[in-house]
Structures are given as C-alpha cells and as structure tokens.
Amino acid sequence: MRKNRATKREILPDPVYNSRLVTKAINAIMLEGKKGLAQQIVYQSFDLIKKKTNEDGIEVFKKALENIMPSLELRVRRVAGSNFQVPTVVSKERKQTLGLRWLILSARKRNEKSMIEKLAAEIIDASKGTGAAFKKKEDTHKMAEANKAFAHLRF
C-alpha cells in the first residue's frame, strides 16, 4: 500500500478553446498516445456540430456533458457474505469523468462512418437528452433508486 494519497496532476487547458474540460475529452479519446489525432477528432467534431446545429460546438458539448453527468452511482459493498449495491453521491470530479467516459464509449459504438461523425452525433444527441450516453445515466439513476433501501450501508 502507498504511504500517502497520490497528488492530482494539473491538466493544462487546450490551445484552441483554452478549456480544461476539452483537454480531458481529448485525453479520454486518445488511444496509444496519439494526442494529435485525438485533438483533430475533438476539434473537427466541434466544427461539425457547429455546421449541423448552428450553435457553438463547445457550448453544445458542455450542455451534453451536463445532461449525462450522474448524481448517484452504485458501489458494491460486501456485508455478512452478501453483496449489496449501495447508492452513493458522486463527487464533481467523478461526475465529469463518468460523463466523458460514457459519452466516448457510446460514440465509439455508433454506426456513423468516422469517429468525428460518431462523436459529433453523440454530443448532439446527449445535448437533446437522447442517445446511448444519456440512457446509461438514466439506467444508473433507476438502479440507484431501486437500491435506495441499502443507502444506510454507506462507505
């Protein structure tokens, strides 16, 4: 076990939008260290969003992320030999991380041609309150509501 908790590294804002949130999205999309490619995907999907919706790409992205960030999550707790799914409140940092993760995973599963189109379509859907990422959040909240009885088993 480690002696102290690891310190959080500061994430630098991205060069185009000067936003830490966009940097987190780029880092989440990045595979095998190809950051330049990840940046292209994110920026071009923001441009595509602007073309399709006539709204600023980053504003639609922020709205989409706001719609899919969960306020509750389920954590498994073992009590007396039984596993219980305990609903817990999610911190701001984890909300953001889960929202980005769900957005990108559901974008990767879509059927559009390129990742740029997939990401843009998923962001637009999430901003409207539809799409796979939004459904994932709704399912998580329903499960948390169903397991409300175990909330007293907090961590």
From Swiss-Prot:
Keyword presence, RNA-binding: yes
Q: What are its GO cellular component terms?
A: small ribosomal subunit
Q: From the record, what ranges are coiled-coil?
A: none
Arranged from A to Z, the UniProt key words for this protein are: Ribonucleoprotein, Ribosomal protein, RNA-binding, rRNA-binding, tRNA-binding
Provide the GO MF annotations for this entry: rRNA binding; structural constituent of ribosome; tRNA binding
InterPro entries with a match to the protein in the record: Ribosomal_uS7, Ribosomal_uS7_bac/org-type, Ribosomal_uS7_CS, Ribosomal_uS7_dom, Ribosomal_uS7_dom_sf
Question: What is an annotated GO biological process for this record, any one?
Answer: translation
| Subunit relationships | Part of the 30S ribosomal subunit. Contacts proteins S9 and S11.
| Entry's family note | Belongs to the universal ribosomal protein uS7 family.
Q: Give a short account of what the protein does.
A: One of the primary rRNA binding proteins, it binds directly to 16S rRNA where it nucleates assembly of the head domain of the 30S subunit. Is located at the subunit interface close to the decoding center, probably blocks exit of the E-site tRNA.
Query: What is the designated name of this protein?
Result: Small ribosomal subunit protein uS7
Instruction: State the organism named in the record.
Output: Malacoplasma penetrans (strain HF-2) (Mycoplasma penetrans)
